[in-house]
UniProtKB/Swiss-Prot annotation:
This is Protein CURVATURE THYLAKOID 1A, chloroplastic. Pfam families: CAAD. Residues 140-164 form a coiled coil. One of its GO terms (biological process) is granum assembly. One of its GO terms (cellular component) is thylakoid. It comes from Arabidopsis thaliana (Mouse-ear cress). It is found in: Plastid, Chloroplast, Plastoglobule; Membrane; Plastid, Chloroplast thylakoid membrane. PANTHER family: PROTEIN CURVATURE THYLAKOID 1A, CHLOROPLASTIC, PTHR33222. It is a multi-pass membrane protein. Residues 115-116 are lumenal.
């Protein structure tokens, strides 16, 4: 008898109480069923309050009947083929491309090794933060230094393009 009284009293404690009147509101979005024939799509939002449910139109999008693509894949492939056929030293391009892939692979190995050392990643973060602060102070903080940076970038562009 004592066990049943203890069990019933513990069950009474474990059952949560729900207030009879809820005064809070919550927004619960739901997904409507898919309709393929519609030209517009509205996402309704149900607001739950003590008085009842209210529907609010949140977002309305319209589907376009024409399909436009900013990049045509056939045009891109033909353009790449024309540029590849126009190259004289194809082996040089392949060597540089392979070298770039190997360089990225090796740099990822080095970064992984640095991250495995316990204190070194934090030191590298501090070095990067210090360099960023120096760069902002040296080139971005004052108007004259921003002009100097723009001139340096333009001269570098000319050197790379071969017009200087």
């Amino acid at each position: 008898m004592a066990i049943s009284v203890a069990a019933s009293s513990s069950m009474a404690v474990m059952v949560p109480r729900v207030p009879a009147v809820s005064t809070r509101c919550s927004a619960v979005p739901y997904l409507p069923p898919r309709s393929f024939g519609r030209s517009s799509f509205t996402v309704p939002l149900k607001l739950v309050s003590g008085n009842g449910l209210q529907k609010v139109e949140l977002l309305k999008t319209r589907a376009s009947s024409e399909e436009t693509s900013s990049i045509d894949t056939n045009e891109l492939i033909t353009d790449l083929k024309e540029k590849w056929d126009g190259l004289e030293n194809k082996s040089t391009v392949l060597i540089y491309g392979g070298g770039a892939i190997v360089a990225v692979w090796l740099s990822s190995i080095v970064v992984g090794a640095i991250n495995s050392v316990p204190l070194l990643p934090k030191v590298m973060e501090l070095v990067g933060l210090g360099y960023t602060g120096w760069f902002v102070y040296r080139y971005l903080l004052f108007k004259s230094s921003r002009k100097e940076l723009a001139e340096d970038i333009e001269s570098l562009k000319k050197k790379i393009a071969g017009s200087e």
